[in-house]
Amino acid sequence: MSQQARVRLAGTSPEDLDDICADVREIANKTGVELSGPVPLPTKTLEVPSRKSPDGEGTATWEHWEMRVHKRLIDIDADERALRQLMRIQVPNDVSIEIVLED
């Protein structure tokens, strides 16, 4: 049984995540390794309520700020050429990528 690499992507822009997933799929097709995914994981919503008025006087009106964190999961066979090309993918600043080798 060959070793697997689990790639976890997280970011605030789903379009950027889909672009990186397409790059990973293209690398898998070029090198001929098996690919499973991308699996969309549940989106986390981080919400911060804040008062509109800075001095605390007047009516209590609130603004709600939110940030959504989208996640994707990809399993790929851990071929040396494929992993080297995975490391060379240009990743935007708002996307984090984590690669874990599994048996």
UniProtKB/Swiss-Prot annotation:
State the Gene3D superfamilies in the record. Answer: Ribosomal protein S10 domain (3.30.70.600)
UniProt key word Ribonucleoprotein: yes
Annotated Gene Ontology cellular component terms:
small ribosomal subunit
Which UniProt key words apply to this protein?
Ribonucleoprotein, Ribosomal protein
Which portions of the sequence form the region Disordered?
35-59
Alphabetically, the GO molecular function entries are: structural constituent of ribosome; tRNA binding
Q: Name one GO biological process term.
A: translation
- Which Pfam family, just one, is annotated for this protein? Ribosomal_S10
Top-rank taxon: Archaea
* Membership in a protein family: Belongs to the universal ribosomal protein uS10 family.
Fill in the subunit field for this protein. Part of the 30S ribosomal subunit.
Explain the purpose of this protein: Involved in the binding of tRNA to the ribosomes.
Please name the HAMAP family in this protein's record: Ribosomal_uS10 (MF_00508)
Its name, as the record gives it, is Small ribosomal subunit protein uS10
